């Protein structure tokens, strides 16, 4: 093809790309304590985005799931355990991306350093604090079952992480089930120790879940957003200090705590496949058997594998 014609074709393609980007609707992203926004900012993935991203802040996964259910946001990140609750509430959601969190204390059941509790079996008759419907809640259930105990053998107190450590340290409860960076904060202080880690008991998956309406109306934006988040996590794996500094600013936690958490955690995207769906179904069935869910939940409708091959729009627009 002659050079003038080649340049003309390239300019037409670029114009079409820019025009398409101008027509794209804003993507409404649920942001849990600024974590996704901070990740995308520090990794450079909020640059050259051919559509607007509107972030909304939520203090925890439960209200984030409620916002998704209500259609107030298009997409948000939450753990597999709270996602089951969202599906159980009838939320028209689908997982569009899954990131595996491989870390030393990504989730853990903690007890005071001087506690006489040495194994999970010692928790019988004790009080455990966690956040209801959280990954910490799921860890307690699985740990108790593995030790031959029932959830009725303990007493639960359901609080947010910011309140949970206070009641553990003042002796109101005997154990706390939580996740990073709270696990790192607690163990670094020397006041708490890990009774059991969720590394072998849980999948430790982080879901990006989108509403069915957003998938229908904003698929192009969602595919691009999924790819950006994936690239951002890959960047964070290789730049733990920079990532930790960004997270310290938004969480208010000391830099050394965030750095320890970042250095001990590796994020890796995994495909949406039959094995993942089976694992979540087992979690849903466990919640049903515990009476936490009032009716059976078929989780197979809550995934969209077509997003497995998502690539960023910016790669072609730049």
Model feature map: region roles:
Residues 22-150, 156-158, 174-177, 193, ...:
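Short, glycine-/small- and polar/acidic-enriched structural segments
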Residues 81, 156-157, 162-249:
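Pocket-lining segment of extracytoplasmic ligand-binding domains
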């Amino acid at each position: 093809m002659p050079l003038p014609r080649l340049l003309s074709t390239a300019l037409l393609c670029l114009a079409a790309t820019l025009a398409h980007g101008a027509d794209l609707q804003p993507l409404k992203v649920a942001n849990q304590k600024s974590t996704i926004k901070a990740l995308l900012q520090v990794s450079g993935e909020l640059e050259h985005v051919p559509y607007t991203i509107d972030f909304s802040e939520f203090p925890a996964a439960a209200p984030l799931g409620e916002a998704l259910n209500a259609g107030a946001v298009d997409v948000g990140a939450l753990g597999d355990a709270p996602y089951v609750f969202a599906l159980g509430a009838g939320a028209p959601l689908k997982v569009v991306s899954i990131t595996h969190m491989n870390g030393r204390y990504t989730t853990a059941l903690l007890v005071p350093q001087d506690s006489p509790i040495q194994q999970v079996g010692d928790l019988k008759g004790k009080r455990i604090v966690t956040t209801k419907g959280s990954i910490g809640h799921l860890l307690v259930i699985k740990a108790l079952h593995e030790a031959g105990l029932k959830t009725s053998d303990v007493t639960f107190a359901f609080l947010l992480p910011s309140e949970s450590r206070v009641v553990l340290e003042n002796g109101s409860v005997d154990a706390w089930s939580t996740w990073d960076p709270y696990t790192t904060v607690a163990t670094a202080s020397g006041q708490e120790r890990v009774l059991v880690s969720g590394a072998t008991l849980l999948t430790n998956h982080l879901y990006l879940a989108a509403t069915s309406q957003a998938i229908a109306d904003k698929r192009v934006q969602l595919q691009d957003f999924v790819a950006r988040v994936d690239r951002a996590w890959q960047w964070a794996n290789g730049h733990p200090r920079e990532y930790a500094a960004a997270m310290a600013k938004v969480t208010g936690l000391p830099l050394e705590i965030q750095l320890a958490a970042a250095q001990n955690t590796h994020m890796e995207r995994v495909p949406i496949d039959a094995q993942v769906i089976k694992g979540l179904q087992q979690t849903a069935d466990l919640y049903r058997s515990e009476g936490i869910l009032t009716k059976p939940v078929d989780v197979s409708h809550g995934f969209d594998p077509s997003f497995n091959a998502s690539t960023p729009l910016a790669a072609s627009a730049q």
